[in-house]
Amino acid sequence: VVKLTQDKRPDITKPLEKPEQLGELKAWSYSALKVFEECPYRSYIQKVKKIQEPSSPAADRGTQIHQEAEDYVKGELGELPASLSKFKNDFEQLRDLFAEAKVELEGEWGFDLEWNPCGWMEKSTWARIKLDALVHEDEQSARVIDYKTGKKFGNEIGHSQQCLLYAIATFFRYPHIDFV
């Protein structure tokens, strides 16, 4: 028995046993895959037992900045938030394109085992892709955007893998697209 109760985690009220088989993960996302690769048991606790880790200040900051970015691009904020000031031109352009209906925000895309698009929470959902923004550049091309607020250096490979996955998903969701 592995004891996972903690004084700081009142939601965990009793020890959890680690079974021989950790259980089936029905669907995955890029971040869920990274958790599984790092520690399958952590993935089991999160996805099968449904016990979430407490949020960190860095994660809270990232969530806040993502929300500010979404609200600004949608036109719900008059002024560009200070947290986005380094990318002022990019966010102004994104906002203009959103006003022209050329940008999708916070897309929740589901795919089945054959990479056919399906609902985010359908029974057949095998993969989940959550895009921050997709810009429809023209009839044949799109641009995938995933905001990053954490550590830049040392994460380049992971970030490029995630963008590649999102590009592949874009091709399956929009078969008429030739370039991402």
Question: Where do the language-model regions lie?
Answer:
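Metal-dependent nuclease catalytic cores that hydrolyze phosphodiester bonds in DNA/RNA
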Residues: V1-E139
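Mg2+/Mn2+-dependent nuclease catalytic core
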Residues: W109-V180
